[in-house]
Design a protein with these regions (language model features):
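Short, Lys/Arg-enriched N-terminal segments with co-localized hydrophobic residues
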Residues: 1-4
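Small-residue packing motifs within transmembrane alpha-helices
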Residues: 8, 12-14
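Bacterial N-terminal signal peptides
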Residues: 14-24
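Sec/Tat signal peptide C-region and signal peptidase I cleavage site
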Residues: 25-29
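Lectin-like carbohydrate-binding module/patch detector with strong preference for beta-trefoil
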Residues: 30-178
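Beta-strand-rich binding-surface signature
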Residues: 80, 379, 542-544
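N-terminal hydrophobic targeting/anchoring segments and the immediately downstream early-domain regions
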Residues: 166-524, 528-536, 553-555, 559-566, ...
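Short catalytic-loop micro-motif centered on adjacent basic/acidic residues
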Residues: 544-547, 602
């Protein structure tokens, strides 16, 4: 931007700073709000229109604390500031040595080595002489930035200043994760623009972007974003997992890693990685942005929690003397996660130059999704995957009014997809008997409901499960994969808990018929009368019903209702349906019935071979069912990153590669770490483009290109 006002002579000494104002060419912005938003990622110098002086950095009175003042009379000595949005309308100002213009008391400004609340400034614009000047108020003090000067005997203050944009090379770039892509458009997402119909691209039907709140917020480290940047979003995880990861109870229990180097940005010594995806985020927003450029059109983000596991976290925190988790109440957790997602949307908008300009867009209807996708952006649907979604476990009071109230609350939040049950039975219906953790889930079901799973022999077309039957001799070292890596305090707590659990379990069961429990067990609980009201309520609100994690009997009953009402809004988002057996071609097979209704199926992603193993056997039957009804056949992916599971392992891969949308991808760089799919696999969500390319190549070479085509039709279907 060119300066719109002539410099004036310095009339007095600068005593303090409190408001920033700048002038800009009016052609850059039509409104004052646009003028503010367009400051994102700019390099600027700040000049007083009254005196012509520039802000410089200098030593304070004692020569120790660095300060800023209008002390410069020429452009060459003026401090350069990089304007990094902290939120919509709020900015960090970082100088060339990565210090931040900050205020912790009225009329004082210092150079902070790292950002804090005093480094955040809310900027507003004022139209001046055909351009704009800007006023800045500190978020910490609530005071504006002023230049105080003397005019004769009169002390005056100036609170509107000119800003001159400088070449980006004159500023220190704010640290950030790289996309490492090349496109034909200045804005990479313009490459993804398409028509509102016949959308080409895929859906990830099962993600957990908000999982950092899981288990009270002390299980999964890292954040999708942070107001102060990537250094804070992906910092060392020892605050949650302890020194050497010794307090990472869930990771040590269900992961195959032992203690770990907790270092985050910029070195990322051990995480993110495919195995540490269990308890470390892979959803930093720039990684998700890179994934979008692979053809990811639609993303279902399931808020996720489990009150039993949160309670265990609470007990562990008490034993360790570490910070306690946030509220374990599911409604509270879902609200926090939904708030986080909308805050992320605003943050991405701020980075992109204003409201609605970011690639990440939360949608509530199919029409909204089509509009967002056509604009080259990622459509995001919010869902819930939790065991106590409606607070209707066997230990709680539950009735139709309670269900309706919760459903109304969730819908008003923006939630559009829900698992009616997850992991445990409820008064709504029965859960599928998950493997390989079915026995652990059985213990959780007892804690949550006061009883174990009821079982019955499975239908021949269903893959049954094996359940342990008492008495038990529980060994902590066998229950926890990395028991020996626990800290002494945590190991003692686990020993006490397991000993107590063993006494209870051996007193009250479970006891099963060996003929059923030895590999042919299905949950005997189906859809209850309360569940019928819930399903009809979801249909009335046009919400998506995710049938994964339901017992076979419950899923059949849900399909009966949907068929009777002609409702197509059913999904199986990651293949956890009917005991993971997708190979039945029977016309009454649940997934075939779901497909005939117009429902949608996504399969869990690992290697190409494992994906094919889930999809291929039933692919023809489901495709035929869709075609018979005139539906476009499409099978999405269900990555389930941060669903407490590992991600796709490394496989041979060649860089660079160019996808069908014309986007060229090189190895992804985050800080000092370069990620290579050949070495790292899908270490974080930003490596989804590599996974999809490996699918394309492998499926094409094996003669299964039709499956890849079905994947790329999945967003439309």
């Amino acid at each position: 931007w060119e300066l719109m006002m002539k410099n004036k002579m310095l009339l007095g000494r600068v005593c303090g700073l409190s408001v920033l104002v700048m002038t800009a060419n009016a052609s850059f912005a039509a409104t004052t709000q646009e003028a503010v938003d367009s400051l994102a990622q700019r390099c600027v110098v700040i000049q007083s229109p009254q005196s012509g002086a520039f802000i410089e950095r200098s030593k304070g009175l004692l020569g120790v604390v660095q300060r800023y003042g209008f002390d410069g009379n020429n452009l060459s000595s003026a401090e350069r500031f990089y304007l990094k949005p902290a939120a919509l309308g709020e900015f960090l100002l970082m100088d060339r040595v990565e210090s931040f213009l900050s205020s912790h008391a009225p009329s004082t400004t210092i150079a902070n080595n790292s950002p804090d609340k005093g480094s955040e400034w809310r900027i507003s614009a004022v139209a001046v002489n055909g351009g704009f000047q800007y006023r800045l108020v500190n978020s910490n003090t609530g005071k504006s930035l002023d230049r105080i000067y003397r005019n004769g005997l009169i002390i005056k203050s100036e609170s509107q200043f000119n800003l001159q944009q400088r070449p980006a090379s004159e500023c220190k770039a704010f640290p950030e994760v790289e996309l490492n892509v090349v496109t034909s458009s200045l804005n990479p997402h313009d490459t993804m623009r398409t028509s509102r119909s016949n959308i080409r691209g895929y859906v990830d039907g099962h993600t957990h972007m908000s999982a950092e709140e899981f288990g009270g917020g002390i299980t999964i480290s890292g954040h999708t974003f942070h107001r102060w940047g990537v250094k804070h979003a992906l910092k060392d995880c020892k605050d949650i997992h302890g020194e050497g990861g010794k307090h990472d109870l869930i990771g040590l229990a269900v992961g195959d890693y032992k203690s770990h180097n907790t270092t985050g940005w910029p070195s990322f010594s051990e995480w993110p990685s495919t195995k540490m995806a269990v308890t470390h985020t892979g959803y930093y927003y720039k990684w998700v942005e890179r994934a979008h450029l692979s053809g990811l059109r639609l993303m279902v983000v399931y808020t996720v929690d489990n009150e039993v596991m949160c309670t265990i976290n609470n007990a562990a925190a008490v034993a360790l003397g570490t910070p306690l988790p946030k509220s374990c109440d599911t409604l509270n957790s879902v609200q926090r996660q939904v708030n986080d997602l909308f805050a992320l949307q605003d943050y991405v908008d701020a980075q992109s130059g204003g409201l609605n300009k970011g690639f990440f867009r939360i949608v509530r209807t199919p029409a909204e999704a089509r509009t967002v996708i056509a604009d080259g952006k990622l459509a995001v649907v919010i869902g819930i995957e939790a065991s106590e979604t409606f607070n209707c476990s066997g230990r709680n009071f539950c009735d139709a009014n309670k269900l309706k109230s919760r459903l109304d609350t969730y819908h008003a939040m923006g939630v559009r997809s829900i698992f009616p049950v997850h992991k445990f039975d409820t008064q709504v219906g029965g859960a599928t008997l998950d493997t390989p953790s079915v026995d652990i889930m059985n213990m959780g079901n007892f804690i949550d409901n006061g009883q174990y799973f009821g079982v019955t022999a499975c239908d021949p077309s269903i893959q049954g499960n094996k359940l342990l039957s008492g008495p038990f001799d529980l060994d902590p070292a066998k229950l926890l994969k990395s028991y020996d890596e626990l800290s002494p305090v945590l190991k003692t707590a686990v020993n006490v808990a397991v000993t107590g659990a063993e006494a209870v379990i051996n007193t009250v069961g479970p006891r099963y018929d060996p003929a059923v429990a030895n590999g042919n067990a299905c949950n005997s609980k189906g859809l209850t009368s309360l569940g019928v009201q819930l399903i009809n309520g979801m249909i009335d609100r046009k919400m998506l019903i995710d049938v994964d994690h339901q017992s076979t009997l419950m899923t059949k009953a849900v399909l009966d209702i949907a068929e009777a009402r002609g409702y197509s809004g059913l999904v199986a988002s990651h293949g956890d349906t009917d005991g993971n057996k997708m190979d039945s071609t029977e016309p009454n097979f649940n997934l075939v019935r779901l497909t005939k209704l117009g429902g949608h199926i996504s399969a869990l992603t690992r290697t190409t071979e494992s994906f094919k193993g889930l999809v291929t056997p039933g692919y023809k039957a489901m495709t035929r069912a869709a075609n018979e009804k005139g539906y476009l056949a499409g099978i999405g992916i269900g990555s389930d990153y941060n669903g407490l599971i590992k991600m796709a392992s490394p496989r041979p891969f060649t860089y660079p590669f160019t996808n069908e949308f014309g986007v060229r991808f090189d190895k992804q760089v985050s800080g000092n770490r370069t990620f290579d799919f050949s070495v790292d696999g899908m270490a974080h969500y930003g490596l989804l483009p590599e996974l999809m390319e490996s699918y394309r190549v492998s499926l094409t070479n094996s003669g299964d290109a039709a499956i890849y085509e079905s994947m790329m039709n999945s967003a439309e279907s």
